[in-house]
UniProtKB/Swiss-Prot annotation:
Its EC number is 3.4.24.-. The chain crosses the membrane at residues 3-23, 119-139. The active site is at residue 435. SUPFAM superfamilies: FtsH protease domain-like, P-loop containing nucleoside triphosphate hydrolases. PANTHER family: ATP-DEPENDENT ZINC METALLOPROTEASE FTSH 2, CHLOROPLASTIC (PTHR23076:SF139), METALLOPROTEASE M41 FTSH (PTHR23076). This is ATP-dependent zinc metalloprotease FtsH. The gene is ftsH. ATP binds at residues 213-220. Residues 1-2, 140-631 are stromal. Residues 24-118 are lumenal. The keyword Nucleotide-binding applies. InterPro entries: AAA+_ATPase, AAA_lid_3, ATPase_AAA_core, ATPase_AAA_CS, FtsH, P-loop_NTPase, Pept_M41_FtsH_extracell, Peptidase_M41.
Length: 631
């Protein structure tokens, strides 16, 4: 280990200062004069002479060459107990010594310590000297840093990471499942590499591309791929790095960022989580955040202001496009908005193929089957799924990832960590009836999603779980599907009521009832699926804290509000009645399924449907996606 004299100096100076201060304090407190030259109060010289004449003075100690006296006296004014009093003596008082001797007062004179002023002077000067020396040393060190002199005060400089040739290790080959977004950015890269092909027909390079989509869908990964493919200087910064505690820092950093970008154009500037600085300006409460709005105004000016920024492509990512300012979204700033959504089954298969490259998978594993089992999973979810499976494989000391680890990983990603298995008891049987109630309703309703698995293995906060496989296209949902989902959610509570009676129903259906109420209310207020008619009665939820105004929410009369509540109650009551009847009609198969579930703890969807099919006819599930395509 190399020893630096600078490090030694930085260590010894504070230690020396602390040691000196401790020594000086200890020296003062142990000095006898320090303790003697202390008084609880003061007294005038005239009053002191009166005390002396009355015989109340017991002892006098003279200090400062006879100019100060510490008097020990007693008297009614002092509470009839001896106290130490400080008295300032006049320069000429020759009669005082005579009076003290006549009164038989104990007198003592103390010599002045000549070394005290010198040490006091050193003690007063050493701290400022060391402070100035330390600051000079710090500024000297900062002058040797890449930023040059004054680096410590460069608050207004941009914190963007700059790469002349970005080496992110990510290319377009590593991006899968978002083909539309990928094509858009491949075109941007082509624009940078071969601009003449586009300018020949009068095309201009896009000034900005905004990536919009849910978390985990690959927005930042796309930006890394562009950086790796473009071959031009690349700046990357987070939206939260603009605004800090000093006023004006945000706007200054925006100016500095675009100044550097213009010096290195053509180039790409990537702003991640742009909603941190680009939220909509508005009234709000208290007029909004002036510092953030000042930063946003500067960003708008730099992106498409009077001077322009030819040769700079701005790429930004956000999952909160609804709160961005309208001026930021217009063409000329962000010419393109690319939606990076959750992948479909084809996209999920491509993503799984990418993340499975470095995984040792058993030959029996079908990535296509995994893709079909994971609707709604984002790219990050799928990457996490395979990583969890690999970790579980290593924990089990296996050489390859099998379908068992894949199943456990899917369950963990969806519902959380696996808990301890329940012991055989009334609680376990009640949970079994609850879960079978969900599953039997989902199986016997034509418009409900098919059952994927029923389990009593606790995960997260849930003691038991029932998985359904939703259809691939969830953008259009019919009224029959919503009613089927309401009945499926009520299946657990209905099974508890039928089997154990109303007094024995539990709180396990609390979350189910929240979902049921939410779906029924949306049917009435949002989708117009009730007797009130095709009306949208939902408030716009304009939040003033997001820069929106406070007076834009829709209003309706108390009569309509009462009718909404009645319709919600009627929908839920109707679904509950039908659900209870289905449970009663299929009590025999439910009892059999509960016994099997308690024995095996997990029943997959195919086995569940096969057992139910032995007792009753199963409806043919409707694929609304194929119906929509045929029309």
């Amino acid at each position: 280990m190399k020893i630096s004299w600078k490090n030694i100096l930085l260590t010894l100076i504070p230690l020396g200062l602390i040691s000196f201060l401790v020594w000086q304090g200890f020296n003062n407190t142990t000095n006898p004069q320090f303790t003697k030259n202390i008084a609880s109060s003061r007294m005038t010289y005239g009053r002191f002479l009166e005390y002396l004449d009355l015989g109340w003075v017991k002892k006098v100690d003279l200090y400062d060459e006879g100019h100060t006296a510490i008097v020990e006296a007693i008297g009614p004014e002092l509470g009839n107990r001896i106290q130490r009093i400080r008295v300032e003596l006049p320069a000429t008082a020759p009669e005082l010594i005579t009076k003290l001797r006549k009164a038989n007062v104990d007198l003592d004179a103390h010599a002045t310590n000549d070394s005290t002023p010198a040490w006091s002077l050193i003690g007063n000067l050493i701290f400022p000297i060391l402070l100035i020396a330390g600051l000079a040393f710090l500024f000297r060190r900062s002058s040797n840093l890449p930023g040059g002199p004054g680096q410590a005060m460069n608050f207004g400089k941009s914190k963007a990471r700059f790469q002349m040739e970005a080496k992110t290790g990510v290319t377009f080959n590593d991006v899968a499942g978002v083909d539309e977004a990928k094509e858009e950015f491949e075109e941007v890269v082509s624009f940078l590499k071969k601009p003449e092909r586009f300018t020949a027909v009068g095309a201009k390079i896009p000034k900005g591309v905004l990536l919009v989509g849910p978390p985990g869908t690959g927005k930042t990964l796309l930006a890394k791929a562009i950086a790796g493919e473009a071959g031009v200087p690349f700046f990357s910064i987070s939206g939260s790095e603009f605004v800090e505690m000093f006023v004006g820092v945000g706007a200054s950093r925006v100016r500095d960022l675009f100044k550097k970008a213009k010096e290195n154009s053509p180039c790409i500037v990537f702003i991640d989580e742009i909603d941190a600085v680009g939220r909509q300006r508005g009234t709000g409460i208290g007029g909004g955040n002036d510092e953030r709005e000042q930063t946003l105004n500067q960003l708008l000016t730099e992106m498409d202001g009077f001077e322009g920024n030819t040769g700079i492509i701005i790429i930004a990512a956000t999952n909160r496009v609804d709160v961005l300012d309208a001026a930021l979204l217009r063409p000329g700033r962000f010419d393109r908005q690319v939606t990076v959504d959750v992948p479909d089954v084809k996209g999920r298969l491509e993503i799984l193929n990418v993340h499975a490259r470095n995984k040792k998978l058993d030959l029996s594993i079908s990535l296509e089957l995994i893709a079909k089992r994971t609707p709604g999973f984002s790219g990050a979810d799928l990457a996490n799924l395979l990583n969890e499976a690999a970790i579980l494989t290593a924990r089990r000391r296996k050489k390859q990832i099998t379908i068992s680890e894949i199943d456990a990983s899917i369950d963990r990603v969806i519902a959380g960590m696996e808990g301890k298995a329940l012991v055989d008891s009334k609680t376990k049987r009640l949970i079994a009836y609850h879960e079978v109630g969900h599953a039997i309703i989902g199986t016997l309703l034509k418009h409900h999603d098919p059952v994927q698995k029923v389990t009593l293995v606790p995960r997260g906060q849930a003691k038991g779980l029932t998985w359904f496989t939703p259809s691939e296209d969830q953008s259009l949902i019919s009224r029959s599907q919503i009613l089927a989902r309401i009945m499926g959610a009520l299946g657990g509570r209905a099974a508890e009521e039928v089997v154990f009676g109303l007094p024995e129903v539990t709180t396990g259906a609390g979350n189910d009832l929240q979902q049921v109420t939410s779906m029924a209310r949306q049917m009435v207020t949002r989708f117009g699926m009730s007797n009130i008619g095709p009306l949208s009665l939902e408030s716009q939820n304009s939040d003033p804290f997001l820069g929106r105004t406070m007076g834009s929410s829709s209003q309706y009369s108390e009569d309509i509000a009462s009718r909404i509540d009645m319709q919600v109650r009627a929908i839920i009551q109707h679904c509950h009645t039908e659900t209870v009847q289905i449970i009663k009609d299929n009590r025999v198969v439910i009892d059999k399924l509960v016994d099997l579930l308690i024995e095996k703890e997990t029943i997959d969807g195919d086995e569940f449907r096969q057992i139910v099919g032995d007792f009753t006819s199963l409806p043919e599930k409707i694929d609304y996606k194929s119906q929509l395509k045929s029309t």
